[in-house]
From Swiss-Prot:
SMART domains: Ami_2, PGRP. One of its GO terms (biological process) is negative regulation of peptidoglycan recognition protein signaling pathway. This is Peptidoglycan-recognition protein SC2. Zn(2+) binds at residues 50, 159, 167. The gene is PGRP-SC2. It catalyses: Hydrolyzes the link between N-acetylmuramoyl residues and L-amino acid residues in certain cell-wall glycopeptides. Disulfide bonds join 57-63. GO terms for cellular component: extracellular region. It comes from Drosophila simulans. The lineage of its organism: Eukaryota, Metazoa, Ecdysozoa, Arthropoda, Hexapoda. The keyword Transcription regulation does not apply.
Length: 184
């Protein structure tokens, strides 16, 4: 029995390593609790990619500062229940929990109830994605499929495709258009 448990742990560890996904929980980065939550359905058909259009961060400490600033702006200035995105990806290659799984975001008007929102920290009209960020995003999307959050044939959009905005910035836009689930 101990051997089976050891094998299971090894398989789970390898699966995490293959996806390359490290999710820093909201409690770990010191995020505030949401004032309310609306459940998000499973097996969604869409994922929407954003950029925060703010400062770029390349260390965990700098990314945590940005996350707290964004959450404060979304909650205190805009009056939202929480940070708008389900997940955010820093220049350090970490995935940071925003609203997380199964909670509706506030990231794309008329699309919040049918998509997960993933945002890159920074302004990608000027910043460029690192290979670690690309790996993290693709791993997160694979994880979302594995969890049943989005369907395997999900459609990937840049925010500009579902709203009047430059988001997710030219550099992310050029990158995601090469990904297999992106649709024009």
């Amino acid at each position: 029995m101990a051997n089976k448990a050891l094998i299971l742990l090894a398989v789970l560890f390898c699966a995490q390593a293959v996806l390359g996904v490290t999710i820093v929980s909201k409690s770990e980065w010191g995020g505030r609790s949401a004032t309310s939550k609306t459940s998000l359905a499973s097996y969604l058909s869409y994922a929407v990619i954003h950029h925060t259009a703010g400062n770029y961060c390349s260390t965990k400490a700098a990314c945590i500062t940005q996350l707290k600033n964004i959450q404060a702006y979304h909650m205190d200035s805009l009056g939202w229940a929480d940070i708008g995105y389900n997940f955010l990806i820093g220049g350090d290659g970490n995935v940071y929990e925003g609203r997380g799984w199964n909670v509706m975001g506030a990231h794309a008007t008329n699309w919040n109830s049918k998509s997960i929102g993933i945002s890159f920290l920074g302004n990608y009209n000027t910043n460029t994605l690192t290979s670690a960020q690309i790996t993290a995003a693709k791993g997160l999307l694979s994880d979302a499929v594995s969890r049943g959050q989005i369907v395997s044939g999900y459609i990937l959009y840049g925010h500009r495709q579902v709203g009047s905005t430059e988001c997710p910035g030219t550099n992310i836009w050029n990158e995601i258009r090469t990904w297999s689930n992106w649709k024009a």
